[in-house]
């Protein structure tokens, strides 16, 4: 029995939508049952009532006419190259099994010969593998935070596949010929920044034919540290103070761990990955002035994201 309420919506299609570049960003679900620590879908960063309703009332809004919106974005964008599913809420959270909107989008993408870029902490049904594999530019990003299942449960506080399930899923998709990016992302300071555990996870991913690994360090919306103080203390006494002392750089409206910590982490992660013949990259990470530091750590993998 689900512990959330579904609210079905069919927002009007904006026929004059602005050009948005090569990525069509698609969120069929507003709200995410995974409830990951510091996730922008549920921490108030996105100033939309739909996301507030999930956090405050347990209501997931689902966009029933999502295919109409996808087609409209394609029509209004000359350079549309990929459907990104999803940039915020997980497309394969438990509600998907009931409503199957993500399945509809993937099937539609296959019908119109448009590649999809999927990002999930959940399980992608095997029935979709042929549709994903059909387009040579489609790929799947599996978010696997750590090899330590107990730590994963601390951070993915709602649903989400286990470490073993995610590794099995990666292996199955790799064997099917689907391009995979493993996202060890984000790194949570003092929780998942153990380099021995990171290396052990990289070894398991390499066994499953993963070639690309992406990472980042968690950033935090203002107020979230205070809201999560009790939870951080339950994980480790003194952890909330460590986070307060580490998250001192406010950049573009969010708090970031100081640049020295982040660069030290990325240098170590890159060294581990490259020593094993894997490509390493980071998602967008700014310095204190808001300038990207990605060029220091990313290779051609960045072009896939």
Give the location of each predicted region.
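Surface-exposed cleft-lining segments at the edges of enzyme active sites
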Residues: 91-92, 150-159, 185-190, 255-256
